[in-house]
Amino acid sequence: MKKLSVVILAAGKGTRMYSDLPKVLHKIAGKPMVKHVIDTAKQLSADQIHLIYGHGADLLKSHLADEPVNWVFQAEQLGTGHAMQQAAPFFADDENILMLYGDSPLISKETLEKLIAAKPENGIALLTVNLDNPTGYGRIIREKGSVVAIVEQKDADAEQLKITEVNTGVMVSDGASFKKWLGRLNNNNAQGEYYMTDVIGLANQDGFQVAAVSATDKMEVEGANNRLQLAALERYYQHKQAERLLLEGVMLIDPARFDLRGTLEHGKDCEIDVNVIIEGSVKLGDRVKIGAGCVIKNCEIGDDVEIKPYSVFEDSTIGARASIGPFSRLRPGAELAEETHIGNFVEIKKATVGKGSKVNHLTYVGDAQVGTDCNLGAGVITCNYDGANKFKTVIGDNVFVGSDVQLVAPVNVANGATIGAGTTVTKDIGENELVISRVPQRHIAGWQRPTKKK
């Protein structure tokens, strides 16, 4: 099998996006369009990925700093052929070269594998698609069924404009052939640009075979030149993700109101209500229920967990049979054990909460360790920050913390301790101790409240 190199064209400015971002950095499912294409190239086990860039070079390089690509600069954008000419010096003669577009993010590995398999030994294969409205696309010109040319919209005559089979721009041939044809391109056309479409005519002139594979799903090859098209690609992508999850057994209450911006691994009988967003890598156990409006990013969630509406989790783990929300926030480093209860307006950050413990209302637990079977009342705060440094609070097992308690870290609360409501804890508490620190309550009989002056 020949080696494979992929060339991704990503030099365009994207004027119709009306944005400072290069077009290919606009996102589908939370990921830049060009990153989708790079990931597909990786799935094909490409030996090299050449990224043609121009506009927004610094932004592209910063967003894609970790990607294994060969950066190829295109100073002037003089057409697709000109872009490929910049990459040609890197082509090995005996390798396959696959040309892709950074603003067509939904192209699939399976379609590209079919295209590569269809490439003649001595020839070129291109990906086409039939469109009801082919306006703006290069038309496929055939003679006796064989592809002989591609004519761009602005260069097509009246008869050619009636053709509905169009060029997607995706093609594959060997490096030696591409280099030969690229050297013979000219810009004698209405746009004054160098078209890769002219390569098909040159291949025919040289007696090379031209194969064509038609994409079965036209959305796979759609690009995004403006935000309307970008939104259409987003909705289509989300529709396909929702469809797949439903067929795998996940109950999406309304598939049209669910967004997956990463990967979701799931067990059986999971149920996800409307307007839930999944980001990054999320793993659900069996029978997990997620209420409306939740946002969950990079989390692992155990069996039989119930997440009530409008909760936001990031980089957290949740044990089996836990109940969380509504309106709860788990920040990075939150680790909840089995059968924990986290209630409304509770925030947990870089903290562990032991099995069976309850933090039910209006509480902040940060940089802390909470043992098993504890109860933290409403308004409890772990005061973990002195303006410069973070400190840890350690709470043992079976500890009761009353409402409106401040735990000023660093502080340790031993097993079985009880802390009365309104207490400010600044010293360690021993095992089974009761701690109360309150201003003595005063009663003033006959007190007259101040009155407003009229």
UniProtKB/Swiss-Prot annotation:
Record text on cofactor binding: Binds 1 Mg(2+) ion per subunit.
GO biological process, one term: cell morphogenesis
Cofactor: Mg(2+)
Region feature N-acetyltransferase, mapped onto this chain: 249-454
Residues binding UDP-N-acetyl-alpha-D-glucosamine, per UniProt: 9-12, 23, 74, 79-80, 101-103, 138, 152, 167, 225, 331, 349, 364, 375
GO MF term list: glucosamine-1-phosphate N-acetyltransferase activity; magnesium ion binding; UDP-N-acetylglucosamine diphosphorylase activity
GO CC annotation terms, alphabetical: cytoplasm; membrane
Binding, acetyl-CoA: 378, 384-385, 403, 421, 438
Stored PROSITE patterns: HEXAPEP_TRANSFERASES
Region (Linker): 228-248
Ligand binding (Mg(2+)): 103, 225
Pathway it works in: Nucleotide-sugar biosynthesis; UDP-N-acetyl-alpha-D-glucosamine biosynthesis; N-acetyl-alpha-D-glucosamine 1-phosphate from alpha-D-glucosamine 6-phosphate (route II): step 2/2; Nucleotide-sugar biosynthesis; UDP-N-acetyl-alpha-D-glucosamine biosynthesis; UDP-N-acetyl-alpha-D-glucosamine from N-acetyl-alpha-D-glucosamine 1-phosphate: step 1/1; Bacterial outer membrane biogenesis; LPS lipid A biosynthesis
Catalytic activity reported: alpha-D-glucosamine 1-phosphate + acetyl-CoA = N-acetyl-alpha-D-glucosamine 1-phosphate + CoA + H(+); N-acetyl-alpha-D-glucosamine 1-phosphate + UTP + H(+) = UDP-N-acetyl-alpha-D-glucosamine + diphosphate
Active site: 361
Subunit text: Homotrimer.
Family: In the N-terminal section; belongs to the N-acetylglucosamine-1-phosphate uridyltransferase family.
HAMAP family for the chain: GlmU
Protein's UniProt name: Bifunctional protein GlmU
